[in-house]
Amino acid sequence: MNTYHPFSLTTPSTLMIQDWAQTNQNNKEVIAGFTTKNGGVSQKPFESLNTGLHVHDKDADVVKNREYIADMFNTDLQSWVFADQTHDNRVQKVTQRDRGKGAREYHTALKATDGIYTNEKNVFLALCFADCVPLFFYDPVKSLVGVAHAGWKGTVKQIGREMVKQWTEKEGSNPSDIYAVIGPSISGACYTVDDRVMDAVRALPVSADLAANQTAKAQYQLDLKELNRLILMDSGLASEQISVSGLCTESEPSLFYSHRRDQGKTGRMMSFIGMKEA
């Protein structure tokens, strides 16, 4: 088994957060991971495990790919929930009544939402990615799991902080009980931005210099993973509560789709998290 800390490549199609794959004190088993591009039925340029219904792939192929992942964990795709991601910072709590939204038809997805969480078992949360940063959250004390989509816009709008805020203010979480994993995404070495983006980064309440490196006039390498880590720490999480994947979607063409590398015409990986009765 190949290990890509904090993920393990458990099948050609799935990277799993093994440290969370345990029963919590409320007798719920956490299933959390990130898909690769391999093992599905989609044809080029979406070959082969495309999970995005919004990229002009054949819907039937995407649904088959999603069903393949759902079946892997002995779940029904109708128990999964997807969102219409808009690069913002809206976080929504998901319950049993939301199951199936966006799973087979894009128009039924949760509207304009980039972060979702639940405290209910057998509700599986899913978001789609092709370079942006997947943020995974877990509070074993309150039995909360969540996932967020953080491109540069969602990052500067601090969607990670918004998730922590909702958990602490609405769900009674203590920041010291919240664990976060920052998943595979484009690395700083592969992600060049301009002053427009950096102006927004510099406005954040964390040090932009720790996440960016100027390479030329008005050109910067921006490490979105590190920026999200700094935001989460500023939100009350200790560094040891945050794990960061070193995997870069742009520089791993055998594993991942990349919007930037593939010039926009590509598939989507899926982040997923949920709890089953142990």
Curated annotation (Swiss-Prot):
Zn(2+) binds at residues 87, 132, 149. It catalyses: adenosine + phosphate = alpha-D-ribose 1-phosphate + adenine; S-methyl-5'-thioadenosine + phosphate = 5-(methylsulfanyl)-alpha-D-ribose 1-phosphate + adenine; inosine + phosphate = alpha-D-ribose 1-phosphate + hypoxanthine; adenosine + H2O + H(+) = inosine + NH4(+). It holds the Pfam family Cu-oxidase_4. GO terms for molecular function: adenosine deaminase activity; copper ion binding; oxidoreductase activity; S-methyl-5-thioadenosine phosphorylase activity. Its cofactor is Cu(2+); Zn(2+). PANTHER family: PURINE NUCLEOSIDE PHOSPHORYLASE LACC1, UNCHARACTERIZED PROTEIN YFIH. Purine nucleoside enzyme that catalyzes the phosphorolysis of adenosine and inosine nucleosides, yielding D-ribose 1-phosphate and the respective free bases, adenine and hypoxanthine. Also catalyzes the phosphorolysis of S-methyl-5'-thioadenosine into adenine and S-methyl-5-thio-alpha-D-ribose 1-phosphate. Also has adenosine deaminase activity. Belongs to the purine nucleoside phosphorylase YfiH/LACC1 family. This is Purine nucleoside phosphorylase YlmD.
